[in-house]
Amino acid sequence: MYEQDTTKYRIHLVVQADGVVDRSDVVGAIFGQIEGLLGSELELRELQRQGKLGRIDVKIQSKLGKSYGEITIPTSVDRAETAILAASMETINRVGPCVSEIHVQSIEDVRITKRTQIIERAKALLLEFEEPGIDPDSLIDAVRESQRIEKIATIGVDNVPAGPNVLASDAIIVVEGRADVINLLRAGIKNAVAVEGTSIPKTIIDLCRKKTTTAFFDGDRGGDLILRELLEVTDVDFVAYPTRGESVEDLSRKEIIKALRNKVPVEYVLEDRVAEYLASQKSEQQTSSIREPEPERGSEPARYQQPAPASDAVISCECTEEIPDAVSEEESVTEYQAYLPDEEEDNRPRTVFTHIREVKNRGTARFIGVGGEMKNELPAGEVEEKLGALEQGLEGIVIDQEINQQLLDQFSMHGIRYLAAPSFTGIVRLPATIRLIPFR
């Protein structure tokens, strides 16, 4: 009896027959046409009796009157005898009643495959064995981290991952996966719930209809598709965007707070007017900062309060909640201050919309450097001809011209981070590193 553990080599062959044949026809052709061809030492039946030839495995299927398949023959004879057996298979020219061809695809050395598996497993075991212990300096952080992450739970019949305050809160943040919920918990945000895939669970659909909802997905095509499906099946109030190309699970605490603070009402997303909304918010902030009266001398300055819409519960009710035994008083103060207007915040979006106002309806293209300064300005019609001469290190491009797929691909080769234009048509491949900003 042949033992599988004694296999040294496997002969892989492909067979093609001009007609419909079965597995039994292929096996019969092998034994019938090889019999007496190689001498008594390599007689197939004798090799099987001695345990040197394994079971001949045949997988065959028929299509349009022809049969195609694969043959695997395990052997435990030496290399030369295995090569002779493989070559003899190519002499078979009939299978059953049909003309056929058999070709050797490869001869696999099973021992090499086993050695490779041994090496890979040994590497994994070595990494586990040599895993370093916890740094004493990070013990406190590790304990705090575990307390936050342990609070993640599952809710509903779909068992979707969620923060501990999702059911009690009047506002929720919908993210992509469990890792995103954990990252928001690290930032002190406890009202996040994950969709876990492109199919929106019924639990989340019902929650979105009852609560103020902010969608917060990855800045890639996958996140865009999930957002589109979420908007089709339920009610969403706001959309928050991370930096284009970045995942929510990789964001720092400051980046998460900034993205949620700059959330956009869903009406502007549906009408593709995100840029217009951000520009209007900027002008309102500037106006309010000019009109705000100075407090009287000797009086205590008023505590900052955000506007009263229900959407504030997404941030103010959940993010500023003190985490027992996990967040110190100093961290709570820092967390509150994160929601105040940040005068030193990155001013790139403001610079972008300034350039948009200056380029709009002028038929020009403006190339923006990393610091927001204008590097060059050309007529929009000449941009495609002079793309090759553009200097590297550009932050973005603002152009008063319709953008198609060909022009977008050329711009992406220069490493820009954003592209502002009146419209984008025929875009089927969106580069992950570029954020498109439409304006009218």
Swiss-Prot record:
<keyword id="KW-0235">DNA replication</keyword>
<keyword id="KW-0240">DNA-directed RNA polymerase</keyword>
<feature type="region of interest" description="Disordered">
    <location>
        <begin position="280"/>
        <end position="311"/>
    </location>
</feature>
<dbReference type="GO" id="GO:0005737">
    <property type="term" value="C:cytoplasm"/>
</dbReference>
<protein>
    <recommendedName>
        <fullName>DNA primase DnaG</fullName>
        <ecNumber>2.7.7.101</ecNumber>
    </recommendedName>
</protein>
<feature type="domain" description="Toprim">
    <location>
        <begin position="170"/>
        <end position="256"/>
    </location>
</feature>
<keyword id="KW-0639">Primosome</keyword>
<keyword id="KW-0460">Magnesium</keyword>
<dbReference type="InterPro" id="IPR020607">
    <property type="entry name" value="Primase_DnaG_arc"/>
</dbReference>
<dbReference type="GO" id="GO:0008143">
    <property type="term" value="F:poly(A) binding"/>
</dbReference>
<dbReference type="GO" id="GO:1990077">
    <property type="term" value="C:primosome complex"/>
</dbReference>
<dbReference type="GO" id="GO:0046872">
    <property type="term" value="F:metal ion binding"/>
</dbReference>
<dbReference type="InterPro" id="IPR034154">
    <property type="entry name" value="TOPRIM_DnaG/twinkle"/>
</dbReference>
<feature type="binding site">
    <location>
        <position position="176"/>
    </location>
    <ligand>
        <name>Mg(2+) 1</name>
    </ligand>
</feature>
<feature type="compositionally biased region" description="Polar residues">
    <location>
        <begin position="280"/>
        <end position="290"/>
    </location>
</feature>
<dbReference type="InterPro" id="IPR006171">
    <property type="entry name" value="TOPRIM_dom"/>
</dbReference>
<dbReference type="GO" id="GO:0000178">
    <property type="term" value="C:exosome (RNase complex)"/>
</dbReference>
<keyword id="KW-0808">Transferase</keyword>
<comment type="similarity">
    <text>Belongs to the archaeal DnaG primase family.</text>
</comment>
<dbReference type="Pfam" id="PF13662">
    <property type="entry name" value="Toprim_4"/>
</dbReference>
<dbReference type="InterPro" id="IPR050219">
    <property type="entry name" value="DnaG_primase"/>
</dbReference>
<keyword id="KW-0479">Metal-binding</keyword>
<keyword id="KW-0804">Transcription</keyword>
<feature type="compositionally biased region" description="Basic and acidic residues">
    <location>
        <begin position="291"/>
        <end position="300"/>
    </location>
</feature>
<dbReference type="GO" id="GO:0000428">
    <property type="term" value="C:DNA-directed RNA polymerase complex"/>
</dbReference>
<comment type="subunit">
    <text>Forms a ternary complex with MCM helicase and DNA.</text>
</comment>
<keyword id="KW-0548">Nucleotidyltransferase</keyword>
<feature type="binding site">
    <location>
        <position position="218"/>
    </location>
    <ligand>
        <name>Mg(2+) 1</name>
    </ligand>
</feature>
<dbReference type="GO" id="GO:0003899">
    <property type="term" value="F:DNA-directed RNA polymerase activity"/>
</dbReference>
<comment type="function">
    <text>RNA polymerase that catalyzes the synthesis of short RNA molecules used as primers for DNA polymerase during DNA replication.</text>
</comment>
<feature type="binding site">
    <location>
        <position position="220"/>
    </location>
    <ligand>
        <name>Mg(2+) 2</name>
    </ligand>
</feature>
<feature type="binding site">
    <location>
        <position position="218"/>
    </location>
    <ligand>
        <name>Mg(2+) 2</name>
    </ligand>
</feature>
<dbReference type="GO" id="GO:0006269">
    <property type="term" value="P:DNA replication, synthesis of primer"/>
</dbReference>
